[in-house]
């Protein structure tokens, strides 16, 4: 498929007619140019680097011509001596530019900057000294030296010396000190700020791609599971029931509050020291403090349960939360074993507890003394033969643990009457 013609009407293309006006002159080009003549003159060294030396040398030459012409024209007594200040500044600028252009390498530039920072203030001070000395020579050492313009220019040049000393020399030394400190800091921090290895970079990339919200939810779920298992273990091993409810609504919604923990009677009887199971009753079930808390003998479900502390062999030492009163043990067929009485002493004062413990110790001592007396009498009765001539012990059917001592005493008392 051929392309359509550029001119579909078939008309020949007529070239544009040339402008009747002639070529623009040099003056018009300069006027319409985007850059001025002075700017082009200044930017010549940028286009041609070798022209820098020409410019620097020209600046120094102009400064020298200005200084010499001023000194010759003024003859040391004219106000034209005040023009020495800009001429001297122009000469110092030319010397500085020439030194910086000659030295191309970084090391050479560093040396040139050091020379400039040290030499320029010395040159300015020498000029000031020359001006002051010329003023003294012109005034023949009289008081007219203070009215001489050369002396005033010397004082102004001394001010320029201090300015150059501050701006060139001191700034150069400050910059060098900062560069040395920066280099020392980089050398010190380079071993610490090392680039990560390939494995470390891979781990960092994996950590960046990880879903932080999902990992946080997983950690929270695992923490709640560990807490739930810990409370279950405490409920199995502890001596009472525990109620737990989380303050976190999400945890409560996910797992719910923990109910009362229940254990088997066999496990509780073997692990808990609070269980009491006499060996003479086959169908007797051990009583646990968990059951006593809910029964009429306990202090109610609202009272706090305190685990029993180990007691000494001399006297029972129960916890302050509950007091356990011992009951006598009866043989099979006699009096039924009673449930241990549990009373709450959470509202008792420490003095009442001490009185109760003292009373308990006194009762224990009285029981021990009575048991010693009974054992002594039983030994005497065993040594003396019974009155009926039999050597066997006369056991009472009502009390199988008695040796008949009380019955014999009653008979003796009746005979004496």
UniProtKB/Swiss-Prot annotation:
Biased composition (Basic and acidic residues): 211-228
Coiled coil: none
Transmembrane helix is among the record's keywords: yes
GO annotations of cellular component type: plasma membrane
Keywords annotated in UniProt: Cell membrane, Membrane, Transmembrane, Transmembrane helix
Subcellular location: Cell membrane
Skewed-composition ranges (Low complexity): 336-347
Composition bias, Polar residues: 312-322, 391-401
Disordered as annotated region, ranges: 1-24, 211-283, 308-417
Residues spanning the membrane: 54-74, 79-99, 117-137, 143-163
Chief localization: membrane
Membrane topology annotation: Multi-pass membrane protein
Protein family per UniProt: Belongs to the chlamydial CPn_0443/CT_005/TC_0273 family.
Protein name, entry field: Uncharacterized protein CPn_0443/CP_0310/CPj0443/CpB0459
């Amino acid at each position: 498929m051929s392309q359509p013609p550029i001119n579909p009407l078939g008309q020949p293309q007529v070239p544009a007619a040339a402008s009747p006006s002639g070529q623009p002159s040099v003056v018009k080009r300069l006027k319409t140019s985007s850059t001025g003549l002075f700017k082009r003159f200044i930017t010549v060294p940028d286009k041609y680097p070798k022209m820098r030396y020409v410019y620097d040398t020209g600046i120094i030459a102009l400064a020298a011509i200005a200084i010499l012409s001023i000194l010759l024209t003024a003859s040391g007594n004219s106000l034209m001596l005040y023009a020495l200040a800009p001429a001297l500044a122009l000469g110092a600028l030319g010397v500085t530019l020439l030194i910086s252009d000659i030295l191309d390498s970084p090391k050479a530039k560093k040396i040139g900057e050091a020379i400039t920072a040290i030499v320029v203030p010395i040159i300015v001070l020498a000029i000031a000294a020359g001006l002051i000395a010329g003023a003294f020579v012109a005034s023949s050492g009289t008081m007219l030296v203070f009215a001489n313009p050369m002396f005033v220019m010397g004082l102004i040049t001394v001010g320029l010396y201090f300015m150059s000393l501050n701006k060139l020399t001191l700034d150069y030394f400050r910059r060098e000190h900062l560069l040395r400190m920066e280099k020392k800091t980089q050398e010190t921090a380079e071993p610490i700020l090392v680039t990560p290895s390939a494995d470390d970079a891979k781990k960092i990339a994996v950590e960046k791609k990880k879903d932080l919200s999902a990992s946080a939810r997983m950690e929270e779920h695992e923490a709640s599971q560990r807490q739930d298992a810990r409370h279950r273990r405490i409920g199995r091993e502890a001596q009472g029931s525990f109620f737990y409810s989380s303050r976190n609504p999400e945890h409560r919604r996910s797992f719910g509050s923990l109910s009362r923990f229940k254990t088997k009677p066999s496990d509780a009887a073997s692990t808990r020291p609070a269980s009491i199971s006499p060996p003479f009753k086959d169908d007797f079930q051990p009583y646990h403090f968990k059951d006593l808390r809910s029964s009429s003998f306990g202090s109610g479900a609202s009272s706090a349960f305190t685990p029993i502390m180990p007691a000494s062999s001399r006297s029972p030492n129960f916890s302050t939360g509950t007091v356990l009163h011992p009951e006598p043990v009866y043989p099979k067929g006699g009096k039924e074993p009673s449930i241990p009485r549990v009373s709450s002493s959470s509202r008792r004062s420490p003095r009442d507890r001490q009185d109760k413990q003292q009373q308990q110790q006194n009762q224990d001592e009285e029981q021990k003394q009575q048991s010693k007396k009974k054992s002594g009498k039983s030994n005497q009765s065993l040594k003396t033969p019974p009155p009926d001539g039999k050597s066997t012990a006369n056991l009472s059917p009502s009390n199988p643990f008695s040796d008949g001592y009380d019955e014999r005493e009653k008979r003796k008392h009746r005979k004496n009457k």
